[in-house]
C-alpha cells in the first residue's frame, strides 16, 4: 500500500512528537511492506512567523493532496498579544473548516500499568474505556457574529452559538455508528434546561436513535456529565456533544489516564483527508528539551491507520507496542515518579523496537492472521 501523509508539526513540542509518530509509521511501513510518503506544511505560530498567516494556502493544498493529515500542536505565549486573526489557534480552526472535519473522536482508555499516575483511585478507573464524539465545525467557536462592540460609551461583546439541524444530525449519527461496534450505549450531553440549541439537539438525537434499535440512548446535562466523568467514569461508552462542551469534557477526561500526553484524537470528514493529532497542547515550557511524551501522537498515528487507511492490524500493533513499553516500566517525564524517565527520542525507540520484535507482537499477528 502507498499512501500520502501530510505532516503539520506546528509549534512547541509538536515538532518533537510528530517526528516520533512519523518514525513509528515508518517502522510499520517496513514491518508490513507499506509505503508512506510524507509531505510537510506550516500551521499556527510557525506559519505566522514564516508566512504571515496561521494557515498558508500552501498548507491547505498540501493537506488536500494527501490521504491523511498528522498534526502536532499549535500556540504559545509568543503570539498571545497578536490580533485575533493572527493567533495560532486560528490556523487549527481554519483547517477544520477547510477539510470539513466535523467529527472529533477522543478515546479514553485505562492502562493498568499507569494506575498510579491517575489522580483517581484504581477502583474508580480500572476498566475505563469510552470515547468522546465531539462536533467540531459549528457552535460558539464558528458562529457569527463574534466581536467586541461599543454601544454608547460601553464596551459589549457577543459570541454566537449556531448550528444547522443537519450538522447536529451527522455528528449524532457518527456517535451511533461508533456505538454499534462497542457496548451499544450513547450518552448525549447538552444544556437543554437553558439553551434552545440543546433542545433541538435532544430532538435530533431521539430521531436518529430510531434507526439504531440496538443502541441505548440517554440524555445528560453537561454539568452532570462533568461530575460523572470523575465520580463514575466507567459508566460511559460513547459520549456525543457539541463543540465547546466536547472541548472541555475531553480535556477533563484526559486526566483519568494520568497525563494529556496519553490521549490521541481523530478529526474525521465524510470526503477527503481526515486529521489526527494528540489532545495535548504545544507545552512551550518543555519544548526542545526532549521531555515531551510522544505517545498521544503515536496513538494518533494508529488512529490514522485505522480510520483513513483501513489498516486495523497495523493500528493494533502500535497500540500493543505502547502497552508493552508501559508495562515494562518505561515512562516519560509527565508520567514518571522521580527523576528516572525516558526522553522523547528514547520512548519512540522503545516503541519501534517492539514493533520490530516478532515475539512482542505475536498475539496481535495471530489474532489478525
Curated annotation (Swiss-Prot):
- GO biological processes: L-leucine biosynthetic process
Classify the source by domain of life. Answer: Bacteria
Keyword flag Magnesium:
yes
Which residues make up the binding site for NAD(+)? Answer: 76-89, 281-293
Q: Which UniProt keywords apply?
A: Amino-acid biosynthesis, Branched-chain amino acid biosynthesis, Cytoplasm, Leucine biosynthesis, Magnesium, Manganese, Metal-binding, NAD, Oxidoreductase
Question: What general EC class does the enzyme of this chain belong to?
Answer: oxidoreductase
Q: Is Magnesium one of the keywords UniProt gives this record?
A: yes
Pathway entry? Amino-acid biosynthesis; L-leucine biosynthesis; L-leucine from 3-methyl-2-oxobutanoate: step 3/4
Give an example GO molecular function: NAD binding
What are the required cofactors?
Mg(2+); Mn(2+)
Give the cofactor note text. Binds 1 Mg(2+) or Mn(2+) ion per subunit.
Give its E.C. classification number.
1.1.1.85
Q: Which residues bind Mg(2+)?
A: 223, 247, 251
Instruction: Name the residues annotated as site: Important for catalysis.
Output: 141, 191
Where is this protein found? Cytoplasm
Which InterPro entries does this entry report, sorted A to Z? IsoCit/isopropylmalate_DH_CS, IsoPropMal-DH-like_dom, Isopropylmalate_DH
Quote the catalytic activity from the record: (2R,3S)-3-isopropylmalate + NAD(+) = 4-methyl-2-oxopentanoate + CO2 + NADH
Q: What is its main location?
A: cytoplasm
Q: Which parts of the sequence bind substrate?
A: 96, 106, 134, 223
GO cellular component, alphabetical, reads:
cytosol
Reported function: Catalyzes the oxidation of 3-carboxy-2-hydroxy-4-methylpentanoate (3-isopropylmalate) to 3-carboxy-4-methyl-2-oxopentanoate. The product decarboxylates to 4-methyl-2 oxopentanoate.
The record's subunit annotation is:
Homodimer.
Name the protein family: Belongs to the isocitrate and isopropylmalate dehydrogenases family. LeuB type 1 subfamily.
Q: What is the protein name stated in its UniProt record?
A: 3-isopropylmalate dehydrogenase
Organism, scientific name: Priestia megaterium (strain DSM 319 / IMG 1521) (Bacillus megaterium)
Underlying gene? leuB
Amino acid at each position: 500500500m502507498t499512501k500520502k501523509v501530510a505532516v503539520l508539526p506546528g509549534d512547541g513540542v509538536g515538532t518533537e512528537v510528530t517526528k516520533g509518530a512519523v518514525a513509528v509509521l515508518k517502522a510499520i511501513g517496513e514491518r508490513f511492506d507499506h509505503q508512506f510518503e510524507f509531505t510537510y506544511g506550516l500551521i499556527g505560530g510557525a506559519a505566522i512567523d514564516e508566512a504571515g498567516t496561521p494557515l498558508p494556502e500552501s498548507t491547505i493544498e498540501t493537506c488536500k493532496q494527501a490521504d491523511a493529515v498528522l498534526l502536532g500542536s499549535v500556540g504559545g505565549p509568543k503570539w498571545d498579544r497578536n490580533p485575533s486573526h493572527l493567533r495560532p489557534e486560528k490556523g487549527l480552526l481554519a483547517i477544520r473548516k477547510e477539510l470539513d472535519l466535523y467529527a472529533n473522536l477522543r478515546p479514553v482508555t485505562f492502562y493498568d500499568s499507569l494506575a498510579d499516575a491517575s489522580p483517581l483511585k484504581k477502583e474508580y478507573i480500572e476498566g475505563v474505556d469510552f470515547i468522546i464524539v465531539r462536533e467540531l465545525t459549528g457552535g460558539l467557536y464558528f458562529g457569527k457574529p463574534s466581536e467586541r462592540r461599543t454601544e454608547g460609551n460601553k464596551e459589549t461583546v457577543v459570541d454566537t452559538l449556531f448550528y444547522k439541524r443537519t450538522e447536529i444530525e451527522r455528528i449524532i449519527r457518527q456517535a451511533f455508528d461508533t456505538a454499534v461496534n462497542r457496548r451499544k450505549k450513547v450518552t448525549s450531553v447538552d444544556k437543554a434546561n437553558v439553551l434552545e440549541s440543546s433542545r433541538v439537539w435532544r430532538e435530533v438525537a431521539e430521531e436518529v436513535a430510531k434507526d439504531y434499535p440496538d443502541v441505548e440512548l440517554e440524555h445528560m446535562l453537561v454539568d452532570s456529565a462533568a461530575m460523572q466523568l470523575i465520580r463514575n467514569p466507567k459508566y460511559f461508552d460513547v459520549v456525543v456533544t457539541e463543540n465547546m462542551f466536547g472541548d472541555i469534557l475531553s480535556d477533563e477526561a484526559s486526566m483519568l489516564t494520568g497525563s494529556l500526553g496519553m490521549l490521541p484524537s481523530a478529526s474525521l470528514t465524510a470526503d477527503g483527508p481526515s486529521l489526527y493529532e494528540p489532545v495535548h497542547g504545544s507545552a512551550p515550557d518543555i519544548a526542545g528539551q526532549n521531555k515531551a511524551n510522544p505517545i498521544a501522537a503515536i496513538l494518533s498515528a494508529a488512529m490514522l491507520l485505522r480510520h483513513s487507511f483501513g489498516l486495523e492490524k497495523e493500528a493494533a500493533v502500535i497500540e500493543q507496542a505502547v502497552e508493552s513499553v508501559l508495562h515494562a516500566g518505561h515512562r516519560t517525564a509527565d508520567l514518571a515518579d522521580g527523576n528516572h524517565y525516558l526522553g522523547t527520542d528514547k520512548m519512540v525507540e522503545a516503541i519501534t523496537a517492539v514493533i520490530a520484535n516478532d515475539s512482542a507482537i505475536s498475539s496481535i499477528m495471530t489474532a489478525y492472521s
